[in-house]
Amino acid sequence: MIVNVDVTVFYRGYHGDCSEMFLVGEVDQAGKDLVQATYDIFNAAIAYCKPGRPYSGIGGVIQEMVDERGYSTISNFCGHGIGKTFHANPYVLHHKNDVNNGIMAVGPKLDVAGQVDRGDGRRQANGAV
């Protein structure tokens, strides 16, 4: 089983959010590969983040690695600015895009909440992927 623990906090007027995945019990190789790919893709997206780069480039990094590994992302999930407001601009798509949502600078905080999926990235009526 793959368990994701997502922790949010509101402290002294600011929001924080973090997430970590854990393998619990017997996990098949496909599950282990998915967790490793998610970790690698998340770290590549973080490594891309530097002042002067467009926020939209994060989606390109994620999309390239997701495609290389045969996975998908859910196009209507996104990362976002975070601080005094939990979900704030800029909203960061997790797929290649040309949305002009600004250039990174020192100071603003960003929640890169990339989701990597084995499915085709479309949500079903019951919410499953």
Where in the sequence are the language-model features?
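Active-site neighborhoods and metal-handling regions in enzymes and metal-associated proteins
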Residues: 1-129
